[in-house]
Amino acid sequence: MVKKAIVTAMAVISLFTLMGCNNRAEVDTLSPAQAAELKPMPQSWRGVLPCADCEGIETSLFLEKDGTWVMNERYLGAREEPSSFASYGTWARTADKLVLTDSKGEKSYYRAKGDALEMLDREGNPIESQFNYTLEAAQSSLPMTPMTLRGMYFYMADAATFTDCATGKRFMVANNAELERSYLAARGHSEKPVLLSVEGHFTLEGNPDTGAPTKVLAPDTAGKFYPNQDCSSLGQ
């Protein structure tokens, strides 16, 4: 019980820090000092949301301090596979809402409700319904459900990085010999990043220098490289 109380208290503190306390409707612009004070810690929530043609959508949401999020949705009682889907993107806070923008540019909205998050409608307004639209604070691992990612892959000195097209964030890539060979073949003689489309998921691994948990891209497929293209290319 004590451990649960501590987890709940930390969730409340982190959530209030995340949402801020000003009254502006747009995303906050903070001074460096304010940004340091309001820097959020990774946070996660879980719950079962309503579903029109299944028993419910088991939803897990993970916010990261780098401004990104990952969501996993599992359709309970679904007859078709796959029944689990993952998505990711960037988050921002307004005066009273949490705004999630996914990798396709679509937005969704939530608001603080105690130590929980309440899902809002597509316009960012409360949903008038008898059904539950609340995600409770929880401690969970990042989902392993594959999702499509596109970004610039670069490999040098036994280390690979991936700069995601949707978020602009750069991640280390888990060791993958096949992907490394494909990159070397695609880049030719030039030592430069190559556009990559790959199915993968995020995981936490210890930083080789500090040992601190670091978010890493773990490829689930061989992926496909597009030489001489970048994130602005129509052919990505």
Swiss-Prot record:
Region (Could contain a copper-binding motif) location: 144-156
Lipid-bearing positions (N-palmitoyl cysteine): 21
Phenotype upon loss of function: No visible phenotype. Slightly copper sensitive. Decreased numbers of stationary phase cells bind to hydrophobic surfaces, cellular adhesion has altered dynamic properties; no induction of cpxR when cells bind to hydrophobic surfaces.
Lipid moiety-binding residues (S-diacylglycerol cysteine): 21
Classification via Pfam families: NlpE, NlpE_C
The keyword Protein transport is annotated on this UniProt entry: no
Record-linked InterPro entries: Cu-R_lipoprotein_NlpE, NlpE_C, NlpE_C_sf, NlpE_N_sf
Signal peptide from the UniProt entry: 1-20
Subcellular location: Cell outer membrane
Chief place of localization: membrane
Motif (CXXC): 51-54
Membrane topology: Lipid-anchor
Keywords: Cell adhesion, Cell outer membrane, Copper, Disulfide bond, Lipoprotein, Membrane, Palmitate, Signal
Domain comment as written in the entry: The mature protein has 2 domains, the N-terminus (residues 21-100) and the C-terminus (residues 126-236) joined by a flexible linker; both domains form beta-barrels.
Subunit organization: Probably exists as a monomer in vivo, can however form homodimers which swap domains.
UniProt protein name: Lipoprotein NlpE
Organism of provenance: Escherichia coli (strain K12)
Source organism phylogeny: Bacteria, Pseudomonadati, Pseudomonadota, Gammaproteobacteria, Enterobacterales
